[in-house]
């Protein structure tokens, strides 16, 4: 049984907790969020506008939120170094704040007594692991790891399958991405990204993403071969990757479908999905796959030039992989 603590109770933190509570060998021991009181934590865990109401019992007292009779200790500490992870015997701290995402800042959890840390955001200094792609490279001496981003988790399994079978010479990715909490309900200040300050619910907003370049970190053979961008669109959840690639080997679209389907039914089952149905984004709400290949949406221009389409629930699929990575780290 791996004892975990969650730091940051936002969209990902709450879903990670929902998923972790379903796993027999994961025990959620503690939760820290300096901005949320216990009654509000319980409320936000129970009611979710996107994923629906939590099916079990949720309550709280002065020092806990209580889910289906299971008491989870709560803290409102701004500095993770001050958390009682040692006395609570925390094996893995899951940091879903988006703040402590580098080795030096995530180290605060180790200083507080956690044995290891899983960061639920891409990191420029912590090693990144994508389940189904490079998790076998994890070694037990690594104390702090990153689960990369939701978009990297969608793109990397597909890119790996395509590269292994046909070779990728170079490629461009676009993610058509649902709104997230960093965006604005009405036009407001966003000094680093002026477009990002525009009304989320009324615009298609071009944005940057490091997701494609990050694939090169988890798949070194693709280093420097992929880059990408994002369009933020007014949907609350579920996003889609368009991967347009120049291949090394000539092939047919039918052959690509066959290869992806075999991977989805084989070694990448549970990470990579496959559909030939006439689907739209809401069909993937609550889908636990990292990436679902849309066979009917892709197109081919020539034997070496294709556009491939893959869906992902950027909240639920990603949060499922966070818990998978926690279990993998605990076993190593």
UniProtKB/Swiss-Prot annotation:
<dbReference type="Pfam" id="PF00044">
    <property type="entry name" value="Gp_dh_N"/>
</dbReference>
<comment type="subunit">
    <text>Homotetramer.</text>
</comment>
<dbReference type="GO" id="GO:0005634">
    <property type="term" value="C:nucleus"/>
</dbReference>
<feature type="binding site">
    <location>
        <position position="11"/>
    </location>
    <ligand>
        <name>NAD(+)</name>
    </ligand>
</feature>
<keyword id="KW-0560">Oxidoreductase</keyword>
<keyword id="KW-0832">Ubl conjugation</keyword>
<feature type="binding site">
    <location>
        <position position="232"/>
    </location>
    <ligand>
        <name>D-glyceraldehyde 3-phosphate</name>
    </ligand>
</feature>
<dbReference type="GO" id="GO:0072593">
    <property type="term" value="P:reactive oxygen species metabolic process"/>
</dbReference>
<dbReference type="GO" id="GO:1904408">
    <property type="term" value="F:melatonin binding"/>
</dbReference>
<keyword id="KW-1017">Isopeptide bond</keyword>
<dbReference type="GO" id="GO:0051287">
    <property type="term" value="F:NAD binding"/>
</dbReference>
<dbReference type="InterPro" id="IPR020830">
    <property type="entry name" value="GlycerAld_3-P_DH_AS"/>
</dbReference>
<feature type="binding site">
    <location>
        <position position="33"/>
    </location>
    <ligand>
        <name>NAD(+)</name>
    </ligand>
</feature>
<dbReference type="GO" id="GO:1990841">
    <property type="term" value="F:promoter-specific chromatin binding"/>
</dbReference>
<dbReference type="GO" id="GO:0005739">
    <property type="term" value="C:mitochondrion"/>
</dbReference>
<dbReference type="GO" id="GO:0005811">
    <property type="term" value="C:lipid droplet"/>
</dbReference>
<dbReference type="GO" id="GO:0050661">
    <property type="term" value="F:NADP binding"/>
</dbReference>
<keyword id="KW-0520">NAD</keyword>
<feature type="binding site">
    <location>
        <begin position="149"/>
        <end position="151"/>
    </location>
    <ligand>
        <name>D-glyceraldehyde 3-phosphate</name>
    </ligand>
</feature>
<feature type="cross-link" description="Glycyl lysine isopeptide (Lys-Gly) (interchain with G-Cter in ubiquitin)">
    <location>
        <position position="63"/>
    </location>
</feature>
<feature type="binding site">
    <location>
        <position position="120"/>
    </location>
    <ligand>
        <name>NAD(+)</name>
    </ligand>
</feature>
<feature type="site" description="Activates thiol group during catalysis">
    <location>
        <position position="177"/>
    </location>
</feature>
<dbReference type="GO" id="GO:0009277">
    <property type="term" value="C:fungal-type cell wall"/>
</dbReference>
<feature type="binding site">
    <location>
        <position position="180"/>
    </location>
    <ligand>
        <name>D-glyceraldehyde 3-phosphate</name>
    </ligand>
</feature>
<protein>
    <recommendedName>
        <fullName>Glyceraldehyde-3-phosphate dehydrogenase 2</fullName>
        <ecNumber>1.2.1.12</ecNumber>
    </recommendedName>
</protein>
<dbReference type="InterPro" id="IPR020828">
    <property type="entry name" value="GlycerAld_3-P_DH_NAD(P)-bd"/>
</dbReference>
<feature type="binding site">
    <location>
        <position position="314"/>
    </location>
    <ligand>
        <name>NAD(+)</name>
    </ligand>
</feature>
<feature type="cross-link" description="Glycyl lysine isopeptide (Lys-Gly) (interchain with G-Cter in ubiquitin)">
    <location>
        <position position="46"/>
    </location>
</feature>
<dbReference type="GO" id="GO:0006096">
    <property type="term" value="P:glycolytic process"/>
</dbReference>
<comment type="similarity">
    <text>Belongs to the glyceraldehyde-3-phosphate dehydrogenase family.</text>
</comment>
<keyword id="KW-0324">Glycolysis</keyword>
<dbReference type="GO" id="GO:0006915">
    <property type="term" value="P:apoptotic process"/>
</dbReference>
<comment type="function">
    <text>Glyceraldehyde-3-phosphate dehydrogenase (GAPDH) involved in glycolysis and gluconeogenesis. Catalyzes the reaction of glyceraldehyde-3-phosphate to 1,3 bis-phosphoglycerate. The contribution of the TDH1, TDH2, and TDH3 to the total glyceraldehyde-3-phosphate dehydrogenase activity is 10-15, 25-30, and 50-60%, respectively.</text>
</comment>
<feature type="modified residue" description="Phosphoserine">
    <location>
        <position position="302"/>
    </location>
</feature>
<dbReference type="GO" id="GO:0005737">
    <property type="term" value="C:cytoplasm"/>
</dbReference>
<dbReference type="Pfam" id="PF02800">
    <property type="entry name" value="Gp_dh_C"/>
</dbReference>
<feature type="binding site">
    <location>
        <begin position="209"/>
        <end position="210"/>
    </location>
    <ligand>
        <name>D-glyceraldehyde 3-phosphate</name>
    </ligand>
</feature>
<dbReference type="InterPro" id="IPR036291">
    <property type="entry name" value="NAD(P)-bd_dom_sf"/>
</dbReference>
<dbReference type="InterPro" id="IPR006424">
    <property type="entry name" value="Glyceraldehyde-3-P_DH_1"/>
</dbReference>
<dbReference type="GO" id="GO:0004365">
    <property type="term" value="F:glyceraldehyde-3-phosphate dehydrogenase (NAD+) (phosphorylating) activity"/>
</dbReference>
<feature type="active site" description="Nucleophile">
    <location>
        <position position="150"/>
    </location>
</feature>
<dbReference type="InterPro" id="IPR020829">
    <property type="entry name" value="GlycerAld_3-P_DH_cat"/>
</dbReference>
């Amino acid at each position: 049984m791996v004892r975990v603590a969650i730091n940051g109770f936002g969209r990902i933190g709450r879903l990670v907790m929902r998923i972790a509570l379903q796993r027999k060998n994961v025990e959620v021991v503690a939760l820290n969020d300096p901005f949320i009181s216990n009654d509000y934590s319980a409320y936000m865990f129970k009611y979710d506008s996107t994923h629906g109401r939590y099916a079990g019992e949720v309550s709280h007292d002065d020092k806990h939120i209580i889910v289906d009779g299971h008491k989870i200790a709560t803290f409102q500490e701004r500095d993770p170094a001050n958390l009682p992870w040692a006395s609570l015997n925390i094996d893995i701290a899951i940091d879903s704040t988006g703040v402590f995402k580098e080795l030096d800042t995530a180290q605060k959890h180790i200083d507080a007594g956690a044995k290891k840390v899983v960061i639920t955001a891409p990191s420029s200094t912590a090693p990144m692991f994508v389940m189904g792609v490079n998790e076998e490279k994890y070694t037990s001496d690594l104390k702090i790891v990153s689960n990369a981003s939701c978009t990297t988790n969608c793109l990397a399994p597909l890119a790996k399958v395509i590269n292994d079978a046909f070779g990728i010479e170079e490629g461009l990715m676009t993610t058509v991405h649902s709104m997230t909490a960093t965006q604005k309900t009405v036009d407001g200040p966003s000094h680093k990204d002026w477009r990002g300050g525009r009304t989320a619910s009324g615009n298609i907003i071009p944005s940057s993403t490091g997701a494609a370049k990050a694939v090169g970190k988890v798949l070194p053979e693709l280093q420097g071969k992929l880059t990408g961008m994002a369009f933020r669109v007014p949907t609350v959840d579920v996003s889609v990757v368009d991967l347009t690639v120049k291949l090394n080997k000539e092939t047919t679209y039918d052959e690509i479908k066959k290869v992806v389907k075999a991977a989805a039914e084989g070694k990448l089952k549970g990470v990579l999905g496959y559909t030939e149905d006439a689907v739209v984004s809401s069909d993937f709400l609550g889908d636990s796959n990292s990436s679902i290949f849309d066979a009917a949406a892709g197109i081919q221009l020539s034997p070496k030039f294709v556009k491939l389409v893959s869906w992902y629930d950027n909240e639920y699929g990603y949060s499922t992989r966070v818990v998978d990575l926690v279990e993998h780290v605990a076993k190593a």
